[in-house]
Regions:
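A short, amphipathic beta-strand motif
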Residues: 1-4, 32
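Short, ordered, surface-exposed loop/turn motifs in non-cytosolic proteins
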Residues: 3-19, 40-42, 120-123
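Short, acidic Ser/Thr/Gly-rich low-complexity loop/linker segments typical of extracellular
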Residues: 21-33
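A short, solvent-exposed beta-strand micro-motif common in secreted/extracellular proteins
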Residues: 42-63, 184
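Structured interaction patches on ligand/partner-binding surfaces of diverse proteins
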Residues: 54-82, 191-205
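Extracellular beta-sheet/turn segments enriched in Thr/Pro/Gly and aliphatic residues
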Residues: 65-99, 213-220
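Ser/Thr/Gly/Pro-rich, low-complexity flexible regions
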Residues: 99-220
Length: 220
């Protein structure tokens, strides 16, 4: 996929078994299909999906006692027949300015963005966290339910209102809370995944280049 919701070429994606030595990998064909030889003695493994200009994605798998393979998501096994990957491209969006303010019963988010792509879908990811002055993609607590959300944008100025009383984003905010916010360019398909070894959550398509510092609001 491109950085929006549009299709890109299905060919040329490299799929490899993580930590295999020698490296076991395959490249997708024009239909997006690939074949990997798998050692029958391998009971758990991760597949790594990469393509130039696209974010890296990992998916974890396990083999049960009956030799059936499942993929693992949020510590739960699922049948591989239901597994499909949509690899998104990296975001081209740079945040030039970002602000947040309370307007009536809404949180107004305004931004100015630039991208070399004049047309096509573009998105920014807004981060939220209470009492975190240095909020960034590296410091925000990604285990929280409402730590971020994605907004569509166009080159230039953008404005978006979030209902304080009805949005799930604000569900655990209380009057007087100081909420810190930051913004980054991201893609519709963020390729977000949690590393099973470190438990860290990664957003491979996020553009870390932002020209603005975090902002804050006081919940009325």
């Amino acid at each position: 996929m491109n950085e929006g919701n549009g299709f890109a070429s299905k060919s040329g994606m490299t799929v490899s078994i993580e930590n295999s030595s020698p490296v076991i990998s395959a490249v997708t064909d024009s239909s997006g299909n690939f074949t990997l030889p798998l050692d029958p003695s391998l009971h758990s493994f991760a597949l790594v999906y990469t393509k130039p200009g696209f974010g890296t994605f990992k998916r974890y798998y396990m083999r049960d006692a009956s030799n059936k393979i499942y993929y693992v998501d949020n510590n739960s096994p699922y049948q591989t027949e239901n597994a499909s990957e949509s690899l998104g491209s990296k975001s081209t969006v740079t945040i030039n300015s970002f602000s947040a303010s309370i307007i009536g019963d809404a949180l107004r988010l305004t931004s100015n963005i630039s991208s070399p792509n004049a047309s096509g879908e573009k998105y920014i990811r807004i981060l939220y966290q209470k009492d975190l002055p240095g909020i960034s993609i590296n410091t925000v607590d990604k285990t929280k339910t409402n730590w971020s959300h994605l907004l569509p944008v166009t080159n230039g100025d953008n404005s978006f209102d979030v209902c304080l009383a009805c949005s799930t984003i604000c569900a655990d905010w209380k009057p007087g809370d100081k909420i810190y916010l930051a913004a980054y360019g991201d893609s519709f398909y963020s390729n977000m995944y949690q590393d099973q070894t470190t438990s860290k959550i990664f957003l491979p398509n996020l553009n870390p280049n932002t020209n603005v510092i975090p902002v804050s609001i006081i919940v009325p």
